[in-house]
Amino acid sequence: MQLNDLKPAKGARHQKLRVGRGIGSGKGKTAGRGHKGQHSRAGGYHKVGFEGGQMPLQRRVPKFGFTSRKELISAEVRLGELNKISGDVVDLASLKAANIISRQIKRVKIFAAGKLEKPVTIRGLRVTKGVKAAVEAAGGKIE
């Protein structure tokens, strides 16, 4: 076998169907579009979600819930990320200085993911039970 002998397997590639080319083709005259109506004409189509004038589904179902504004100023930090902080005190300012959280964040919760490799003092931040155990096991404390 040579490179110039390569060809796709039989039946792997289909020829493009040419519509509107006579009744013998099986797709002549209306070219599979049916008779009249919006879908038979060129250029006309409805917008997504339009149901022909009937009240659409997204307007029939009731609204629910809301987006909390606290989400914009809250962040979650992994326990393993505390190793990036140079000092031994972890607070909001030190997390911002180490580029772990953005400047607009005002509420932080630390959750147990990763390993803590040094004793740290966590000040003014919320922590999970797993983090509390891990920090105390590493010789640190939570204030």
UniProtKB/Swiss-Prot annotation:
Q: Which organism is it from?
A: Coxiella burnetii (strain RSA 493 / Nine Mile phase I)
Basic residues compositional bias, start-end: 30-39
Question: Gene3D superfamilies of this UniProt entry?
Answer: 3.100.10.10
Q: Hey, what's the signal peptide range on this chain?
A: none
**Where is the organism placed in the taxonomic lineage, from the top?**
Bacteria, Pseudomonadati, Pseudomonadota, Gammaproteobacteria, Legionellales
Its GO biological process terms? translation
Task: Describe the task this protein carries out.
Answer: Binds to the 23S rRNA.
Protein name as catalogued: Large ribosomal subunit protein uL15
Offer a single GO CC term for the protein.
cytosolic large ribosomal subunit
